[in-house]
Amino acid sequence: MSPDQEPAPRSTDPGKPAAARPLRAHARRNREKLIAAARAAFTAADDGAPLEGIAREAGVGIGTLYRHFPTREALVEAVYAAELEAVTADVTALLDELPPERALRAWMERYARFVATKRAMVNTLHSGWASGRITAPATRERITAAIGSLLAAGARTGALRGDVEADDVTAMLLGVFLSTAAEGDPSRTGRLLDLVVDALRTPVPSP
């Protein structure tokens, strides 16, 4: 067995598929390294990056890559899922570190990066959307839930308005990203995100 090979999982239940069981630690590390290498490759180029190069960058053989991800689509979808999980999980940590209004702005920046890197994978992601393996409504629900947590925290402190629907903010952000997609100008995206946050602040009472 070569260093990058993973032992085939053994089942004590012949009726249970091997893929349904948790990965062993070595296999899990290899999977994480492959996703990290693929994320870097897709961000730097596009989802046409050679799989052999991704495996080499991850420090594993091409056979290991195909054991985890039988198709390019499976790898792209895994990168998408990992990044979506990361961007939605950031909310708790940001609220622990920053006031809600600043946490919201920082999270928007991370979400903008998430959206920007997906442009390089969009052709392959289309097949996932078409097949139902990736659902746009589910993605939007998770993003909206993250925004809702940030808005609720801001409303509790009085820093952010309490009369705004989280899904309306999701729509605003998608509008920002769509309007700036062709420009590739992060500074303009940042200015527009500042305007969104300003619109969400609790109005200062008139004297």
Description of each model-found segment:
Residues 1-18, 113, 145, 149-157, ...:
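C-terminal peripheral helix-coil segments that are non-catalytic and often amphipathic
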Residues 124-132:
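Short linear capping/connector segments at secondary-structure termini
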Residues 76-83:
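Alpha-helical DNA-contacting segments of helix-turn-helix folds
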Residues 73-75, 120:
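A secondary-structure capping/hinge motif
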Residues 85, 117, 131-167, 171-174, ...:
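Amphipathic alpha-helical packing segments from all-alpha helical-bundle domains
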